[in-house]
């Protein structure tokens, strides 16, 4: 890719030199036909550059932003040269990227690969590992496993001596949300009782409260939480029949750096009004 840019620069310089040489010869008048020929050739060169450089630029951008296979190879090479915490950081970053591109099988293999490393690491890495598993289970629509992982997260939040990435109040708040979310996934949405509706209202309230926090946590996880709770608000409003609010929050899941598959389901729902797509 770099060679292609260097070649384009060389072509541009050659075309410019040819154009100037042709103009000088034409002005002198001694070899006028040769001068015209050089000018025409240089103009053709300029036209070729004008058509090829934008394509090259777009191809480079596409490679930088969308080549998940190249990104994967690069991250694995870096991880191979690292150990301990640095290796885990690189692999966790890779798993996020793979999940964002729906490479779920490879994400699962890497999660299994880092499991022994996580067991020997600090509680913060155990939490990150659980959140990655939660995201993977959500993408696979395995809500039973989501509930199991949420229970483990609650236990970690309540027993961990580390503050992980959260302030103390936010820490407790998140644990409470996860408890209600676990209950939410077990509801029978076709036959909601009064107590079921209380769970939905409480989860809706807690998620809105969490999103109103002004202090900033670690950027990556803060964005993940914002995405997750926008989604929870969307589907709780959906169960309450407030489609307008549901659409607002579900659309917000598309305005984050990480792909959330529920956004596609949200778009489908608002086209078909089929609630079963969510549950």
Question: Model-predicted segments: where are they?
Answer:
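Long, non-transmembrane cytosolic or organellar matrix-exposed soluble domains/tails
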Residues: 194-279
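Helix-turn-helix repeat elements of alpha-solenoid scaffolds
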Residues: 30-33, 59-76, 98-113, 140-159, ...
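Juxtamembrane interface helix immediately N-terminal to a transmembrane segment
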Residues: 1-14
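Solenoid-like repeat scaffolds
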Residues: 42-49, 76-86, 112-123, 151-165, ...
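Intracellular, membrane-proximal regulatory regions of polytopic membrane proteins
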Residues: 94-190
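Membrane-interfacial hairpin junctions
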Residues: 22-37
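"A position-specific structural signal for the A-helix of alpha-solenoid helical repeats
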Residues: 58, 89-96, 125-135, 171-185, ...
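Transmembrane alpha-helices and immediately adjacent membrane-cytoplasm interface residues
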Residues: 36-66
């Amino acid at each position: 890719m770099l060679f292609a840019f260097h070649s384009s620069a060389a072509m541009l310089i050659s075309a410019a030199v040819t154009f100037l040489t042709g103009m000088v010869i034409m002005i002198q008048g001694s070899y006028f036909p040769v001068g015209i020929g050089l000018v025409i050739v240089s103009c053709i060169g300029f036209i070729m550059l004008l058509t090829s450089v934008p394509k090259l630029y777009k191809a480079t951008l596409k490679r930088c932003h969308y080549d998940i296979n190249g990104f994967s190879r690069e991250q694995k090479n870096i991880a191979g040269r690292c150990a301990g915490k640095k290796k885990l950081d690189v692999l966790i970053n890779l798993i996020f990227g793979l999940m964002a591109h729906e490479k779920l099988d490879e994400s699962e293999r890497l999660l299994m690969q880092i499991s022994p490393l996580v067991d020997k690491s600090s509680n913060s890495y155990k939490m990150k590992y659980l959140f990655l598993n939660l995201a993977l289970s959500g993408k696979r629509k395995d809500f039973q496993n989501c509930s199991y992982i949420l229970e483990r997260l609650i236990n970690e939040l309540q027993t961990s001596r580390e503050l992980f990435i959260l302030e103390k109040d936010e820490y407790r708040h998140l644990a409470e949300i996860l408890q209600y979310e676990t209950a939410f996934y077990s509801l029978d949405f076709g036959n909601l009782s009064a107590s079921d509706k209380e769970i939905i209202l409480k989860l809706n309230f807690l998620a809105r409260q969490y999103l109103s926090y002004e202090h900033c946590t670690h950027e990556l996880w803060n964005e993940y939480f914002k995405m997750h709770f926008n989604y929870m608000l969307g589907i709780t409003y959906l169960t309450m029949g407030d489609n307008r609010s549901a659409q607002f929050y579900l659309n917000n899941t598309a305005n984050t750096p990480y792909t959330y598959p529920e956004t596609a389901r949200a778009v489908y729902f608002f086209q078909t009004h089929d609630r079963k797509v969510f549950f």
